[in-house]
A protein has these predicted regions:
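Flexible loop/turn segments at secondary-structure boundaries
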Residues: 271-272, 296-301, 334-339, 425-430, ...
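Active-site-proximal substrate-binding groove within the catalytic cores of carbohydrate-active enzymes
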Residues: 204-205, 213-219, 223, 396, ...
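Active-site groove signature of glycoside hydrolases
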Residues: 286-295, 401-432
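Active-site-adjacent "subsite" loops/lids of carbohydrate-active enzymes
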Residues: 318, 329-408, 483-502
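Short, Gly/Pro- and small/polar-rich lid/capping loops
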Residues: 1-5
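A structural motif corresponding to the C-terminal end of an alpha-helix
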Residues: 316-325, 408-416, 449-458, 529
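Carbohydrate-recognition beta-sandwich/jelly-roll modules
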Residues: 10-289, 294, 310-315, 319, ...
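Aromatic- and glycine-enriched glycan-recognition loops and surfaces
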Residues: 260-358, 363, 397-404, 441-447
């Protein structure tokens, strides 16, 4: 039931009752228990519907004086209502329905103005009870109070940083959650906190870039519901939807049989044959996954997409294969060296930032980061500074060039597993659409193209989200923080591995050397997130004469 009563919309489903005023949910109760999840707040403090501009200006669609406006409720049918906004700086609609099967309250916001440059439409859920903790697919799973300094005021773009389109608010033995079932690769963002309330969430729908002339955004529906139990209850429902929406049962059948048997991973593994002998003394090789970055004739992060094995790299790979190790030489997804011969063929399809218009990528010199040169000439002259640009994966020509190069290496060595770097780089862009695909959709297509090369390849990646996990077998996981003091607080949870660990497992990315207190704290984070125990070592001696931390990892992996 969705019913308008004056300036309020009342909603009743099989699971909840809700009251909506001026676009805000001002009451959300469990029908089973009567538990209320929203505390009282002043709906006039800020607007429920907002526009975010490319300049980072946030415009409120409200009716506060002196910028007077009108916000009214409209009954369209017994099961459908709208909150209509006619305000000083823009207009908008919040569509309100209910799902009779799930009991979800469905909210679909949209807004626009005459001023160009709109990036997103934001709908705000305010007044969340202060005991509720955010459980979110950010950096492979976090659980923190909304006002925690690690996340307060933060904004996470889907799917690169907000890795699945859901957010869970966990109480003692119950909670509420919000999610989308969008399958059109619509860009979104999650804002933690609002202008007037730390205990709030902002749910954004972004327009595809370019946005310089864009006037509005919308078109994504958000489902809100309550639940009994812990966060795994709504997460399981979302996982079930994922499996059906993307036919992931078929993807499960493609994963290698060795994936669940891996008990140890080495990130950034050196090509030292003695290291293989030392590892084999502690852990059966068939249970070890090696990420090998420096196996080519070229230096690391230079001359992509050229993948030619050096004699040293080839000897290491063949010895590891003969011993039974699973190894993944380091390739890439979208990075390429602009000093290379294929750059002129692809230059028109480089990633450009949605906000600044600058080229995505980097250079590296004197131990520090450099931006990509904006001189077309300079970009082609500085291999010594490891300049890399990113080519949109929606471009079929790029996937062809990359695939041909990876296939040649895979057949030469030969390989059954590869690691593809920067697969997490799938954000909205100034040039978001190439050949009808966003970077997110294009990256999934690229990963699947690589996995189908030759007789088939298991593909690893950097970072992991609900799009790339559909094609990846394993992925390096980035940390929310590397600050030792912040790491002492148990912020991590295994939400992401709960969602898709059957398809793709995570391994450590950094601080896996077991040499410091920071390394120990990082291992606790990765353990909490369900990662494969991971080491980063420089020599065989670190295995034969391990620190206590390394010894603990080896002992568990070898059991």
């Amino acid at each position: 039931m969705v019913r308008v009563e004056g300036d309020r919309v009342l909603v009743e489903t099989g699971t909840l009752t809700a009251v909506i005023e001026k676009g805000f949910i001002t009451s959300l109760r469990s029908r089973r228990t009567g538990e209320e999840f929203i505390r009282p707040f002043d709906v006039s403090q800020e607007a429920a519907l907002q526009l975010l501009y490319r300049s980072w200006d946030l415009v409120q669609l409200d009716d506060r004086a002196p910028k007077e406006g009108e916000i009214r409720c409209l009954q369209l049918s017994p099961e459908r209502a709208q909150v209509v906004f006619h305000c000083w700086d823009g207009d908008g609609v919040i569509e309100i329905t209910a799902d009779p099967d799930t009991g979800d309250l469905i909210i679909e916001p949209s807004a626009y103005g005459s001023r160009p440059g709109v990036v997103s439409c934001r709908w705000v859920i305010r007044g969340l009870r202060e005991d509720l903790e955010l459980v979110a697919p950010v950096k492979q799973g976090l659980r923190l109070p909304l006002d925690d300094p690690l996340i307060k005021g933060s904004r996470w773009e889907w799917p690169m940083f907000w890795e699945a389109q859901l957010a869970i608010l966990q109480g003692d033995k119950s909670g509420l959650w919000v999610h989308s079932q969008d399958t059109r690769f619509r860009y979104k963002a999650l804002r933690v906190g609002s202008e007037s309330d730390a205990h709030a969430l902002g749910l954004e729908t972004e327009a595809y870039g370019p946005v310089e002339g864009n006037l509005g955004a919308g078109g994504v529906a958000w489902g809100v519901n309550v639940y009994d139990g812990d966060w795994r209850v709504p997460a399981a429902r979302y996982r079930d939807w994922l499996w059906k929406a993307y036919d992931l049962a078929a993807e499960e059948r493609k994963r290698p049989a060795w994936l669940p048997t891996i008990t140890l991973a080495l990130s950034w593994c050196p090509t030292d044959p003695d290291l293989l002998d030392a590892l084999a003394q502690r852990v059966p090789p068939e249970r070890v996954l090696l990420h090998v970055p420096n196996w080519r004739t070229d230096q690391y992060d230079e001359n992509y997409p050229a993948f030619v094995a050096s004699d040293e790299g080839k000897a290491f790979i063949r010895k590891a294969q003969a011993m039974g190790f699973h190894l993944a030489p380091h390739f890439n997804t979208v990075d390429m060296d602009p000093t290379g011969p294929v750059y002129p063929l692809l230059r028109d399809f480089q990633y450009r930032d949605l906000w600044s218009g600058r080229l995505h990528g980097w250079g590296w010199a004197d131990g520090g980061y450099l931006s990509v040169p904006e001189s077309n000439l300079a970009r082609t002259k500085h291999r010594d500074k490891k300049v890399m640009v990113k080519i949109h994966p929606g471009l079929a020509m790029w996937r062809s060039v990359l695939g041909e190069s990876i296939l040649a290496a895979a057949q030469d060595l030969p390989l059954d597993t590869v690691f593809t770097d920067v697969s997490l780089c799938v954000s909205n862009l100034q040039n978001a659409m190439v050949e009808g695909m966003t970077p997110a959709e294009g990256m999934l297509r690229l990963i699947r193209d690589v996995s189908s090369l030759g007789d088939g390849l298991a593909v690893g990646g950097e970072g992991l989200n609900e799009i790339t996990m559909q094609g990846l077998t394993f992925a390096q996981a980035h940390l929310l923080t590397e600050d030792p003091e912040q790491l002492k607080r148990p912020y991590a949870c295994d939400l992401n591995q709960f969602l898709w660990g059957k398809l793709c497992r995570i391994i450590g990315y950094t601080h896996c050397g077991g040499q410091s207190e920071t390394d120990r704290l990082v291992r606790a984070v990765y353990d909490a997130q369900g990662a494969i125990p991971t080491l980063t070592v420089d020599s065989a001696e670190e295995i034969t004469s391990p620190t206590p931390e390394v010894e603990e990892v080896l002992r568990k992996a070898g059991r």
